[in-house]
Every structure is written in C-alpha cells, then in structure tokens.
C-alpha cells in the first residue's frame, strides 16, 4: 500500500508528464485525475488547486537542480573546475534525468502568480547568484578574463538550458560529448 507521500509523488509525476506534453493551460484537473486512475474529487483530496500542483512540480524541479547540479559542486574550491562541473551536471539534468520538470520550470514560470511565483523566482535567483560568485572567483584568480558576472551567468544558463529544445538522445552526441562541446565553446570560445 502506498503512503500519502508516495501517492502525491505519483500524482505529480503524472501531472508533470501531461503538462510537459500539453502545457499547463491545455491540461485539466480531469485529465490528471484520469491519468492517475482516480476521480477529480479524489485528486483534490491531495492537491488543493491546479496552481498548487504546478508549484509542487516546480519545487521538485528546483530540488533536482540543487541536488544534482549545485550539490555535487559546492565544495569544489577551484572556481573554474566548479563551473565546468556545474555545466556538465546541468547538461546531464536537462538531457537525461528530468526533462519534464526542467521544461515546466522554463515554460510555465509565468503561469505562477503571487507568493508561488516569488518562491520559485527566489530559488532560481540562488542558482544565478551561485554562478555569478563562481565567475567572479574565477576572474579574481585570473582563470578567465574580466567580464560582467551577471552576463556570464545568464549566458551560461541560456546555453545550457536551451539544449532541451534541440538535443536528441538518439542523435550524434552523447550527453557527455554535449557537455564537453558546450564547455569547450563556452570556456575556450571560437577563436583559434
């Protein structure tokens, strides 16, 4: 028998799958209830509103970022090595592990309102600040040239996170090759 936490996780996984495929506005609570094999009333027993469900999915996605991207690199003292490991972990997360949740964070962030939006934005800001600090440390050590740390952080994120739009696991590059290639372009540039 499932615990209530396991049941909620199962509901959120089904909801994430549907929202990933149909978008938040295109997914009804009835769709989610049907996918979970329950009534809509039963679904509302676990989740109060559709926005609360979206918020829970986004929190789960941010938990994954913190656990799989930032967690393993936070104790790497060398800032350039930390940035390169962050890039590899982020590419892995986007391409292999949790594409649905990451896509939902990227596509549906403007759907949230009020406190829910502020909660997710605060968590996203922590990641940006982590990157900014890492770029600033790498500049201070002379590992990279002087650039605007905020511009570097958002360029990093744009480059890495956009891969979910075009990368295909059955394509020419493995996730590791993709991370190496993006890292080479990002940290070494295009010039010979």
Annotate each language-model stretch with its function:
Residues 50, 57, 61, 65, ...:
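Hydrophobic/aromatic residues within well-ordered alpha-helical segments
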Residues 47, 106-112:
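Short helix-capping/turn signature of helix-turn-helix
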């Amino acid at each position: 028998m499932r615990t209530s936490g396991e049941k909620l996780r199962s509901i959120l996984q089904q909801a994430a799958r549907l929202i990933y495929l149909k978008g938040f506005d295109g997914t009804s609570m009835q769709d989610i209830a049907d996918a979970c094999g329950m009534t809509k009333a039963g679904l509302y027993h676990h989740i109060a509103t559709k926005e609360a469900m979206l918020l829970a999915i986004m929190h789960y996605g941010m938990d994954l970022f913190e656990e799989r991207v930032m967690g393993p690199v936070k104790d790497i003292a060398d800032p350039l090595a930390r940035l390169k490991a962050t890039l590899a972990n982020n590419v892995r997360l986007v391409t292999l592990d949790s594409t649905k949740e990451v896509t939902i964070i990227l596509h549906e962030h403007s759907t949230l309102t009020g406190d829910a939006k502020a909660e997710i934005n605060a968590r996203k800001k922590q990641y940006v600040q982590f990157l900014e600090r890492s770029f600033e440390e790498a500049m201070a050590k002379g590992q990279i040239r002087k650039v605007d740390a905020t511009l570097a952080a958002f360029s990093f994120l744009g480059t890495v996170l956009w891969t979910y739009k075009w990368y295909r696991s059955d394509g020419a590059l493995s996730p590791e090759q993709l991370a190496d290639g993006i890292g080479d372009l990002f940290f070494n540039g295009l010039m010979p």
